[in-house]
A protein has these predicted regions:
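A short small-residue
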Residues: 9, 53-59, 85-86, 373-382, ...
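N-terminal, positively charged nucleic-acid-binding surface of large information/translation enzymes
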Residues: 1-201
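Phosphate-backbone binding interfaces of nucleic-acid-interacting proteins
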Residues: 569-703
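Intrinsic disorder at enzyme termini
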Residues: 508-596
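Beta-strand segments within the central parallel beta-sheet cores of soluble alpha/beta enzyme folds
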Residues: 325-328, 509-511, 621
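Helix-rich, typically C-terminal accessory recognition domains appended to large enzymatic cores
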Residues: 382-418, 428-530, 661
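Structured secondary-structure scaffolds
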Residues: 1-46, 98-102, 145, 168-408, ...
Length: 703
């Protein structure tokens, strides 16, 4: 028996769970249930990520304390996870005494071992709010062209990049106050000290997916940099210990204490139920015991950097064991596109649960998930077809076709022998490959193998035709024999599907009158065995309920402009929106419906390269990262041409975060194929590329 600790990434405590989040938690839960079914001791912990400026500001906006804010969100998260049958052994919060203890312990050990440094950093400071301003919280006039209301890192009009301290007439977007320049000591984790260790660690077989390890190599090639791990008050988080009296209000950056939350949640479980469960913290986290236990992190591919570089380096530097493996997954698209509020495909967990069975989604995700970091697509038509065909039409149908004959004619008792032992043995033997697929996180393969077994059962029933035999006098024993074989196969299918469909399989367990659905139980044949009354195990997916879910997920777009204008208002109260003309047009513009607007997919893109096009004075050629990956998880770039060469030098745009229309049909041009369109704003013949905050990830959509 293996001893395994499993975690999922910690959801941030400032908003609800949606289907994109659930890919990870359902994937992890299925793996945990499968490994438990295979006889291993598996512990699954998680927590809310509950610190940071965003939470502090969200609480202030809601008129509550940060503690109340995170408590309310945690309760909502736990309800959503329970609704989708995600069975944590412990769900905690990073705002806990255990997390504070281990965050400070790790920091102190890193400090003592020479891995912490500090230096003065100058930043703009809001004297009214009493906090330092990140670039997204300060605006002013461009130091080059004088354009007003530009963010603290680049000008949307002329494309110049600069430091926030270079803005003319800056103001805080939080208060409207004029910021002052203020120096502050920042603390850094010296990540380059662990470069050799990390290169070896990330290349160990089985530690990371190959595509992830290859991506991390780019960071090693560029050279690791010291990591800023401190924030100044006011900040919602933990204070950094042992700072000088002159620097009393230094806090850990949220990404330092967030992964420590894995340890803290497990420690909380050990303290509360360790004796009962046979769990000891040091067995899983001390270096001395790392060969006797295993630790697995399930995460999204967008946070690999923190988990595969910072986190193992922190643990190594502080004398703790490092994870056995980190399993990254891709993103979720819906109907082949990024999730969209306007299209009703940005679906919250609660909205789904109000309309549909959670096990539908668990099965559909399982049928799509593999060990790769490739994105998965929730096609709602395919979703309905697959669930109805596989689960209702194939699996449940076996029991519903046979149970009546056993109850009505044989006193609910199965035959004393198995008339087709070779067929049943094939299904039992298939369990070896199914178990291996589960362990390797190749869930889609496991589902295919299970459905192949279901097909064999239905082919057997169709061949024997028990409904016809039942009408022939003297053939009732044969009917009992056929149904006994079919229901034994059904039992195997239930064993195999239990990690994915725990509720349905529990109903099936009661119907079959068996004690266990663990993998080993499949070897015990049901002969001379009494079954219970059959009740419906799963209903077909109702198309109207899917439509109702989508409709309920569509936000009232009439409210969006007011919200956008409010968010972009400066100290004068005037709207600062740049994407549209500053004055209302006097000409008439044809109106379009929301369905027309919803057809356009606007995707956040990172400019990886930008070049002049020889022979085309007006064109620039862009290489964009729009968040797409190939089957191996490598970035799949897009080539886009844009007629803005007269307004920009190529080097001005490299590294920018722009908006690309990604669902335009590819256009063949003289100089190559253009695979999208970069958005620009136009006034008086001047084109300005629309740029976004660099913190927004490639692949996010405007909705």
């Amino acid at each position: 028996m293996r001893k395994i600790l499993v975690t999922s990434a910690l959801p941030y405590a400032n908003g609800p769970i949606h289907l994109g989040h659930l890919v990870e938690y359902i994937q992890t839960d299925i793996w945990v249930r499968a490994m438990k079914s295979l006889g291993h001791q598996v512990t699954y912990v998680c927590a809310d990520d509950a610190h940071g400026t965003a939470i502090m500001l969200k609480a202030e906006a809601n008129g509550v304390t940060p503690e109340q804010q995170i408590a309310d969100v945690k309760a909502s998260h736990e309800k959503d996870f329970a609704g989708f049958l995600v069975d944590f052994d412990n769900y905690y919060s990073t705002h806990s005494p255990e997390n504070e203890h281990y965050s400070q312990l790790i920091y102190n050990r890193l400090y003592e071992n020479g891995h912490i440094s500090h230096k003065a950093v100058e930043q703009l400071y809001d004297p009214e709010k009493g906090l330092f301003l990140a670039d997204r919280f300060v605006k002013g006039e461009c130091p080059k062209c004088g354009a007003k209301d530009q963010y603290g890192d680049n000008c949307e009009v002329c494309g110049t990049t600069y430091n926030a301290t270079e803005l003319k007439n800056p103001y805080s977007t939080l208060s409207g106050a004029t910021p002052v320049l203020k120096s502050s000591i920042h603390y850094f984790f010296n990540l380059p000290n662990f470069s050799e260790f990390l290169q070896n660690w990330t290349r160990k077989e089985g530690r990371l997916q190959t595509s992830i390890a290859n991506k991390l190599q780019e960071w090693f090639d560029a050279g690791l940099a010291n990591w800023d791990i401190s924030r100044d008050a006011p900040y919602f988080g933990f204070k950094i210990p042992n700072t000088p009296a002159s620097e009393p209000d230094k806090y850990f950056y949220v990404w330092l204490d967030a992964p420590v939350g894995y340890m803290a949640s497990f420690k909380n479980l050990c303290d509360q139920q360790g004796a009962q469960l046979g769990l000891h913290f040091d067995d899983y986290w001390s270096k001395e015991n790392h060969n006797n236990t295993e630790v697995y992190h399930f995460i999204g591919k967008d946070i690999v950097y923190f988990h595969a570089l910072f986190w193992p380096a922190m643990l190594e530097g502080a004398g703790f064991r490092t994870p056995t493996a980190i399993n990254a997954h891709g993103f979720l698209t819906v109907n082949g596109e990024k999730m969209s509020k306007s299209r009703g495909t940005f679906i919250k967990a609660d909205t789904y649960l109000q309309n549909l069975d959670p096990e539908y989604l668990r099965y559909y995700f399982a049928s799509k998930l593999s060990a790769s970091v490739e994105d998965i697509n929730l096609d709602l038509e395919d979703f309905m077809q697959k669930v109805n065909s596989d689960l209702v039409g194939k699996v449940v149908n076996i029991a519903s076709r046979c149970a009546g004959f056993i109850h009505k004619n044989h006193g609910s008792k199965l035959a004393l022998t198995i008339s087709e032992p070779a067929l049943l043995q094939q299904i039992i033997d298939a369990g070896e490959d199914i178990a291996a697929a589960y362990e390797a996180r190749e869930f889609s393969k496991a589902m295919r193998l299970i459905m192949a077994c279901a097909d064999k059962a239905n082919e057997y029933i169709d061949d024997k035709k028990p409904w016809a035999l039942n009408k022939v006098e003297g053939q009732q024993a044969e009917v009992q024999a056929v149904c006994t074989v079919a229901l034994n196969i059904f039992r195997q299918l239930v064993v195999y599907l239990a990690p994915v469909l725990p509720l349905m399989c529990e109903k099936a367990r009661i119907f079959l009158n068996v004690d266990s659905l663990d993998f080993d139980s499949r070897h015990a044949l049901l002969v001379g065995h009494t079954i219970n009354a059959f009740t419906p195990l799963m209903q077909r997916v109702d198309k109207d309920k899917v439509a109702a879910m989508v409709d309920a997920s569509k936000e009232d777009l009439n409210k969006q402009p007011a919200i956008a204008n409010q968010a972009a208002t400066g100290p004068s109260g005037a709207s600062k929106t740049k994407a549209a003309a500053s004055e209302q047009s006097t000409g008439e513009t044809a109106l379009i419906g929301i369905d027309d607007f919803a057809k356009v997919t606007m995707t956040v893109a990172k400019v990886l390269a930008c070049n002049n096009v020889e022979g085309a004075d007006k064109l620039l050629q862009f290489t964009l990262d729009v968040g797409e990956t190939d089957a191996q998880g490598n970035v799949k770039t897009r080539n886009v041409f844009s007629g803005i060469a007269k307004f920009y030098n190529p080097e001005q745009l490299v590294g920018k975060t722009v908006v690309c229309v990604t669902n335009l049909a590819p256009r063949k041009m003289k100089f190559g194929i253009s695979e999208g369109m970069i958005l620009s704003a136009e006034k008086a013949g001047q084109l300005t590329v629309v740029t976004l905050d660099d913190h927004i990830p490639a692949g996010a959509t405007l909705a």
